[in-house]
């Protein structure tokens, strides 16, 4: 049944169900149990389990994506759309693997790494994950702050304060249980999707060219490869692989293999829908940038400049939609990043920082960037490249653990999926290695 303790294994504080809120949780638990028993079908069966993939999908629409996708569309038009599509497909596979790992084992990825890997590897993964968390929050926090500043005509520092307050307000919903927090994040996901649907309707598109470059791989030059690696780093997020496996634990527990298989099917469907929306948003970002900037400003690389250029090219509505999407993305992804950081520390170190302490630690680099006068967009793009280097660690760990019979039992990954997931991991590691070689040559 739904956990009733004050702390879940994934490290989140859950509401005290001894209060009268327990009575309000019963219908949701009953609906979930009915779905697992096969007494509910269709959308009604899926709804009680919606949440983990929706939260994880925010990581695929964070401000780092805005920065890299604007560069991709402005510099290369539609020619890197296939990278976005491929990265999204890989993300679906690995998020489904992460959710399955949590459902089958009852533990999150970080906990399993601690249990099954040597201590030096565990320490290395934890340190790399914390660096990735700071790099992630750098992009998320700066993106939200920049949007606040431009939308409300505030100094950037004031935008940072406003973003911090908005993030804390959403995190405070966790005290009421995971459902209110999930509902708030789902609403923000809907806002981002609606904004970019509006952008596509405003910006004229060459749909034939977009369809062609969606399926025909092209890397025009070395700079395009760097952006492609950044797209992968911005699209497939290390922290969401840890987080998703943890989020599956705070829900109703299957009582037998039949219910477990149903739960995994529901999880896979949610992954496809939630990350399908994230993929649409990322494709729309590149297409909007291609339409607005490729012909007139191919060197566009600054989010602030992109906003100011959008208004004369596509009209004020396009500029407002862009900022609302960026603001929503920055605030929501910052919340999710904090949640993921809790899972990582609890899993690897068996320790928990308070949410507010973790929030303070991870936003410190963002304040440092502004204080030093660094270019905000360049810092955001650099953070995505950092993420692409950290990414292979949780991917390899997830691949190894998902294939082990002593961890997954009868649910261990079968050979065809091992080959696909292994190939994707090798490609990403190879791209990162090439990027390092190119940087020094």
Curated annotation (Swiss-Prot):
Q: Does the keyword Ion transport apply?
A: yes
Q: Does the keyword Transmembrane helix apply?
A: yes
Q: Which GO terms describe its biological process?
A: iron ion transmembrane transport
Where in the cell?
Cell inner membrane
Alphabetically ordered keywords of this record: Cell inner membrane, Cell membrane, Ion transport, Membrane, Symport, Transmembrane, Transmembrane helix, Transport
Any one GO CC term of this protein is: plasma membrane
Q: Which residues cross the membrane?
A: 41-61, 74-94, 116-136, 141-161, 183-203, 223-243, 271-291, 311-331, 360-380, 381-401, 419-439
Q: According to its UniProt record, what is one Pfam family this protein matches?
A: Nramp
Which domain of life does the UniProt lineage start with?
A: Bacteria
Which GO terms label this protein's molecular function in UniProt? Answer: cadmium ion transmembrane transporter activity; manganese ion transmembrane transporter activity; metal ion binding; symporter activity
Instruction: Tell me the membrane topology, using the record's own terms.
Output: Multi-pass membrane protein
| NCBIfam families reported in the protein's UniProt record | nramp, Nramp_1, PRK00701.1
**Family in the record:** Belongs to the NRAMP family.
Chain's role: H(+)-stimulated, divalent metal cation uptake system.
What HAMAP family does the record point to? NRAMP (MF_00221)
Protein name in UniProt: Divalent metal cation transporter MntH
